[in-house]
Amino acid sequence: MGSIELKKVKKWFNEVNVIKSIDLKIYDGEFLVLVGPSGCGKSTLLRMIGGLEDTSMGDILIDGQVVTNFPPSKRGLSMVFQSYALYPHLTVEENMGFPLKTAGEKKNVIKNRVEKVAKVLKLEKYLNRLPKTLSGGQRQRVAIGRSIVRNPTAFLFDEPLSNLDAALRVDMRLELAKLHQELKATMIYVTHDQVEAMTLADRIVVLDSGSISQIGTPKNLYEMPQNLFVAQFIGSPKMNIIKFRDIYNSSNIDQELRDFLLTKKRVANIGIRPEHIKIVMNSKGHVKATIDVIEYLGADTYVIVNADTLGGVRIRCESNIKFERGLKIGLKFELSKIHFFDQEGINLNL
């Protein structure tokens, strides 16, 4: 078992309330990702679950037992940090087996468990090597292996891939996804990278200033953001947000779009993702625009256009279509994919 529940959890640092009454249930075997911008409280919340930070108010339960005041060693959890924190003078095998050694396990038990975990992480041929001879990705796998050998109730990951270069991060994301499928263990993962969140999570918790902004599957958050904050945070590149008054009063939009914009009341902003806009030639479509910037990314090309007072609108296109800067074009919106947000940022579509 590995279920974790937070009940009305709060955290203060002196007079500053950094975690604001969070209720959250993490299910046994779930891969849950805590995501949000810097300073949103995601790492603090993870450390509170692990017992590395005190909980000011509320309760933390692991498998139904209240552990709010338990020290980290009594919670049965294992943490992997951004820093590998390996002992440089110990071999890979000794590093991985260190938690079991300090717990007083027998040598044969330690050896068997380390070898089993090393096989899962493809570290068998590195067991006799020192950390300094390993790549960054291999060192992180050793750090993960050290947490696995303890057979914890759940794993807590605090931005474990942020020290790796872009290519290694992609590889390690795949390794973590495979590891979760194999272990079927509960994993709570903190990141500021929403791509990591989208590719790894069963569910994502989006945090904003110490509060939960939305919880849901990656698909749910991407397609049905509850508010403007989630709409702009989830997705790469982010959703185009246009002030309602700017687009409605623009002389560059056609009557079909103008009529559609009036189907909702109390609208302050509209949002539409880059893939839900198509470029049409001869300035036809819903909006007249001029190509300002072209970003070629291989399989996709992103075109940023200037459309009167609307600001820069980004469109995703296939790379086999050629465009030139300064070309006058039209934008065709997929009307059913437009999101309407009120003055408080609430999605009026939901």
Sequence positions of predicted segments:
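Helix-to-loop junction immediately C-terminal to a conserved catalytic motif
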Residues: G50
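ABC ATPase nucleotide-binding domains
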Residues: P72-F229
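Conserved ABC transporter NBD signature motif
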Residues: G58-V66
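Pre-Walker A (P-loop) beta-loop-beta motif of ABC nucleotide-binding domains
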Residues: I22-V33
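Conserved coupling/switch loops of ABC nucleotide-binding domains, chiefly the family-specific signature
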Residues: S56-D59, V109, S209, I338
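The feature captures the beta-strand-to-loop junction immediately N-terminal to the Walker
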Residues: V35-P37
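Non-catalytic connector elements of ABC transporters
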Residues: P237, Y248-L350
